[in-house]
């Protein structure tokens, strides 16, 4: 997001002060939140894929919820742990580095090599014992709606909650934005890869798609949000 007015205000407020700031720019954040979040794609997909497996069984094929254009677009994921560790690195630089870092903007993501949904979707689905497939030619090449599927099968999700003793309030809550998965996975139809050269000059860490997404799903499972 581009908060230009906020950045201008921070520059004005920090001028001549002992404190400074750093502008951190991730792409889609891959992580865990305990109490719902309007932009938490891992939670939306975890609910969808858990329920999909419950209804269709292990080994079922899951069509990508987007289109052929978004399926092949280049992008970078930004896992919450990498973002956090970068922020720690940026805010604990030595005194001689501080002037070089203060007020700077940094793209922050998991890998300098961009990926695609065609590479990520099968990995994400495999966590749930499912097979991720490319967009279908049916329905104009547009894939299914994850949050719509969960809403339509709400009673079956409630069965899962009861059977596995899960936390409630994840389906139909007022904090999660149902259109976010479609926005990210269907409407983003252009390459948007990030240049991480500047980030890696200050702090270098790379995380695979599997490690980033599986860690988020593990945390949802440990919190009893998914079975």
Q: Which positions does each model-derived feature cover?
A:
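Active-site loop of classical SDR/Rossmann-like NAD(P)-dependent oxidoreductases
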Residues: 183-196, 211-213
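Conserved Rossmann-fold NAD(P)-dependent oxidoreductase catalytic core, especially the SDR/UDP-sugar
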Residues: 1-2, 22
């Amino acid at each position: 997001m581009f908060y230009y007015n906020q950045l201008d205000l921070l520059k004005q407020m920090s001028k001549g002060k002992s404190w400074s700031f750093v502008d951190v720019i991730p792409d889609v954040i891959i992580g865990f939140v305990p109490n719902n979040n309007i932009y938490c794609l891992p939670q939306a997909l975890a609910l969808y894929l858990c329920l999909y497996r419950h209804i269709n069984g292990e080994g079922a094929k899951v069509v990508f919820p987007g289109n052929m254009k978004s399926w092949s677009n280049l992008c970078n994921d930004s896992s919450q742990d990498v973002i956090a560790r970068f922020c720690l690195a940026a805010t604990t630089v030595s005194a001689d580095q501080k002037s070089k870092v203060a007020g700077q903007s940094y793209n922050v993501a998991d890998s300098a090599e961009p990926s695609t949904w065609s590479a990520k979707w099968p990995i994400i689905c495999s966590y749930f014992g499912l097979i991720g497939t490319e967009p279908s030619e049916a329905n104009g090449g547009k894939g299914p709606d994850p949050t719509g599927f969960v809403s339509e099968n709400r009673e079956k999700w409630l069965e899962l909650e009861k059977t596995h003793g899960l936390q409630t309030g994840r389906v139909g809550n007022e904090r999660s934005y149902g259109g976010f998965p479609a926005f990210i996975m269907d409407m983003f139809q252009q390459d948007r890869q990030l240049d991480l050269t500047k980030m890696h000059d200050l702090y270098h860490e790379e995380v695979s798609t599997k490690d980033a997404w599986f860690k988020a799903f593990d945390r949802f499972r440990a919190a009893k949000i998914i079975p």
